[in-house]
């Protein structure tokens, strides 16, 4: 179908696809994955997010310049736990795809995310977010370039009613163009204060201790993160994304709902993308502010490029990615020196990395090899993670962890969930971190985290959702 057909035609096509899948399920005596996709008229997936998010149904919004989608409803959830979570999901996904019934231009796909560290501390506000949770969404609305599509997915079981399944999905398609629920903005809180003087001193003391550990040779780099917990008004997550879209067009936008909590952000960092056997990633480490004018901006950027401390920190990330990708690659392309990635408030050292993969083994094995890179964990990985578990004093949850999608043809894309916040009823948790090496300065690193927190604070404040007064909670 070139465009979403009239209801009767859509119902007939979906019924036929579901009948094939149910018949195959009966023959195999096990459930069978079914995916049916159609072209539709232009439609912004963000507006569907705004119309459909009911604050309980699992869903995920994702936006980059080349691809945006809203995935709603969980037809199947693949979970993994502990150190083998990536491998377990990969194994189950391959089994499902082997017998899948597919109709239309799109392959079956999963979307979701992972905890930063399954062995790390756990707090109640992250309870709904598993070690690994990738869902087969019932309905996904996509914009890819100039193409707009909808993907219907289900796990067909022997004896199911194909007509009832088709009618259910058609009824959802009829709601695609419902208007988004927009809540009026309350009073804007304006510029948000950061941590108290005592909390700042506590944070800088943690940084100082970590830097001392680097100098003592315990590890070459460690990343410490901190969180701010703030009272939160009654806001629509999609409106936060709408604001981030306007202010941070160069970032990767995401929002993932589990239960009554929504984790969202505007990340500058891709972990890895696979398309047609080619892997694309980058090393992103080393940070400085943007300038007030073009001349100051150029001066600050050059200072970052000339900084021995930041170049050393950056090179640790480059070498870790090289080591992780080499076993999977026929060709690995890494520039000799970094460039700059300029964002709205900060600029980073950035080295793009490409790999021609040796086989079609899938993206989850690359996630396991890459995560966490030294940009969000440290180097060496094991020693840095042990230090974070013992000294950071917070549950990162899905912060700084892989979040994205993969399909049944070996393609996929996962970002690193940075510049983010977890929204729960009545309160929001904002996250930021910084990489520490032997000559890091606590006051400078504190200011860096303030810059990184500012994007999400400003977005929440702009729609009237953030209270000026921090909750009385330690900053880590």
Curated annotation (Swiss-Prot):
Keyword terms:
Isomerase
| Disordered: annotated span | 181-202
Its Gene Ontology molecular function terms?
isochorismate synthase activity
Report which superkingdom the organism of origin falls in. Answer: Bacteria
What are the transmembrane regions?
Answer: none
Q: Which EC number applies?
A: 5.4.4.2
Catalytic reactions of this protein: chorismate = isochorismate
Cite the annotated pathway.
Siderophore biosynthesis; salicylate biosynthesis
Q: Name one GO biological process term.
A: pyochelin biosynthetic process
Q: Tell me the function of this protein.
A: Involved in the conversion of chorismate to salicylate.
Family statement drawn from the similarity comment of this UniProt entry: Belongs to the isochorismate synthase family.
Name of this chain's protein:
Salicylate biosynthesis isochorismate synthase
Q: Which organism is it from?
A: Pseudomonas aeruginosa (strain ATCC 15692 / DSM 22644 / CIP 104116 / JCM 14847 / LMG 12228 / 1C / PRS 101 / PAO1)
Gene it is expressed from: pchA
């Amino acid at each position: 179908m070139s465009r979403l057909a009239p209801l009767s035609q859509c119902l007939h096509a979906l019924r036929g696809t579901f009948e094939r899948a149910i018949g195959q399920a009966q023959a195999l005596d096990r459930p069978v994955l079914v995916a049916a996709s159609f072209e539709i008229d232009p439609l912004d997936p963000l507006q569907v997010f705004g119309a459909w998010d009911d604050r309980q149904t699992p869903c995920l919004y994702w936006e980059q310049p080349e691809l945006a989608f809203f995935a709603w409803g969980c037809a199947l959830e693949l979970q993994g736990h502990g150190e083998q979570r990536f491998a377990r999901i990969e194994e189950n996904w391959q089994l499902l795809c082997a017998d899948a019934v597919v109709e239309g231009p799109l392959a079956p796909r999963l979307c979701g995310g992972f905890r930063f560290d399954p062995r790390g501390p756990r707090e109640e506000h992250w309870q709904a977010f598993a070690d690994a949770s990738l869902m087969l969404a019932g309905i996904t609305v996509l914009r890819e370039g100039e193409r707009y599509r909808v993907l219907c997915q289900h796990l067909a079981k022997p004896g199911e009613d194909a007509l009832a399944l088709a009618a259910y999905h058609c009824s959802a398609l009829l709601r695609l163009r419902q208007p988004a629920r927009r809540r009026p903005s309350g009073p804007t809180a304006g510029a948000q204060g950061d941590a108290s003087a005592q909390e700042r001193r506590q944070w800088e003391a943690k940084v100082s201790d970590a830097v001392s550990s680097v100098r003592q040779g315990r590890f070459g780099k460690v990343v410490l993160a901190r969180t701010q917990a703030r009272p939160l008004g009654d806001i629509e997550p999609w409106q936060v994304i709408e604001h981030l879209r306007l202010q941070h067009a160069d970032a990767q936008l995401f929002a993932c709902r589990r239960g009554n909590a929504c984790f969202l952000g505007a990340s500058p960092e891709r972990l890895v993308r696979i398309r047609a056997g080619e892997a694309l990633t980058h090393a992103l480490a080393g940070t400085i502010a943007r300038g007030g004018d073009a001349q100051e901006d150029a001066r600050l950027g050059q200072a970052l490029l000339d900084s021995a401390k930041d170049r050393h920190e950056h090179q640790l990330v480059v070498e870790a990615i090289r080591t992780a990708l080499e076993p999977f690659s026929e060709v690995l392309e890494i520039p000799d020196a970094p460039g700059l990635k300029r964002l709205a408030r900060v600029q980073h050292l950035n080295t793009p990395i490409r790999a021609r993969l040796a086989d079609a083994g899938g993206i989850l094995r690359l996630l396991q090899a890459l995560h966490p890179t030294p940009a969000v964990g440290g180097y060496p990985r094991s020693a840095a993670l042990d230090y974070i578990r013992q000294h950071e004093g917070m549950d990162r949850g899905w912060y700084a962890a892989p979040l994205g999608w993969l399909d049944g043809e070996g393609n996929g894309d996962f970002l690193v969930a940075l510049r983010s916040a977890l929204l729960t009823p009545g309160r929001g948790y904002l996250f930021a971190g910084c990489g520490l090496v032997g000559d890091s300065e606590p006051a400078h690193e504190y200011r860096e985290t303030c810059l990184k927190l500012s994007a999400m604070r400003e977005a929440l404040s702009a729609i009237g959702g953030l209270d000026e007064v921090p909750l009385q909670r330690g900053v880590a």
